[in-house]
């Protein structure tokens, strides 16, 4: 098995290193995190490199580079301190549109490609429907040749500034036998109210409550086929969970390297603290977790490129990497001591971000349930 990157992948990784060294991005990220602002300038710089085209098919102007290349790029971005969680819609979000969306919907999204601006996101979660997606109450109702959307969504990421969202709703005409359908919604339509929510981490990507009060839609705004909503979002969930896991690894690697440099420089009791056995033990455990994450993610990326990845694989990556990465960052923060918990060290941001990832994108508990079912299914 060859673990070396090919020439194309090496070029992408080298380009990432060059970009991250081109200016003091960390100061920019710290400012965006403090003010809960989307880092549009950074995302635009990545789009200029073609990162938004990595998984896009060649016939649509993309690179069709594959998931292994995506993994290599994502890991390097994270290792160098980039908030890759703001990029979840860039590499693969286009592809569900190309398959499910109408040409008009595709054109609207593609108009934002390469701009660095947020383009779209899905709106599924509701106050009474988190992990239990089937309990959602938002409805669409047909009246006088129009469709009217009513209800509310909560904890919807990337929704403060995005021009379009894809809303999951149930048919109001069939309450006893729910029909779940997605709708492509222009956020400028009357009847939409967006309330930005504060959160512990992942602060560069907005989190909002959205209410719909008789928002008027047309049949052409249907996204995909009627009644097919759950099938599409299942694939989107798997895709998101893999990207979250990649982000977790990169962030943990960055924290690990920050702590290692500090341990070799910080002197206490007359010598570098990295010479103390208890500190060495922390780094041994961190290294084991990082290596396990990396191997798991590259295997999943290879499976994705070969069409064999499953929901169980995505759940395993999401659960293991979210937890292992948090443990790595927590240990790295312990090594840094007061430096890590006071002032403006980026590790405090990493700690907050990774704690959120054990809930967002699918809770730890739901990943365990998904994985357990998938494992036992293999032996039926």
Curated annotation (Swiss-Prot):
Enzyme Commission number, as recorded: 1.3.8.13
Source organism, top-level taxon: Bacteria
SUPFAM superfamilies xrefs: Acyl-CoA dehydrogenase C-terminal domain-like, Acyl-CoA dehydrogenase NM domain-like
Cell compartments where the protein resides: Cytoplasm
Gene Ontology terms describing biological process: carnitine metabolic process
Cofactor dependency: FAD
Pathway: Amine and polyamine metabolism; carnitine metabolism
Top-level enzyme category: oxidoreductase
Stored InterPro entries: Acyl-CoA_DH_CS, Acyl-CoA_Oxase/DH_mid-dom, Acyl-CoA_Oxase/DH_mid-dom_sf, AcylCo_DH-like_C, AcylCo_DH/oxidase_C, AcylCoA_DH/ox_N, AcylCoA_DH/ox_N_sf, AcylCoA_DH/oxidase_NM_dom_sf
Cellular component, GO annotation: cytoplasm
Substrates-to-products reaction catalysed: 4-(trimethylamino)butanoyl-CoA + oxidized [electron-transfer flavoprotein] + H(+) = crotonobetainyl-CoA + reduced [electron-transfer flavoprotein]
GO MF entry, a single one: acyl-CoA dehydrogenase activity
Keywords, alphabetical: Cytoplasm, FAD, Flavoprotein, Oxidoreductase
Function: Catalyzes the reduction of crotonobetainyl-CoA to gamma-butyrobetainyl-CoA.
Subunit structure: Homotetramer.
HAMAP family: CaiA (MF_01052)
Family from the record: Belongs to the acyl-CoA dehydrogenase family.
Entry protein name: Crotonobetainyl-CoA reductase
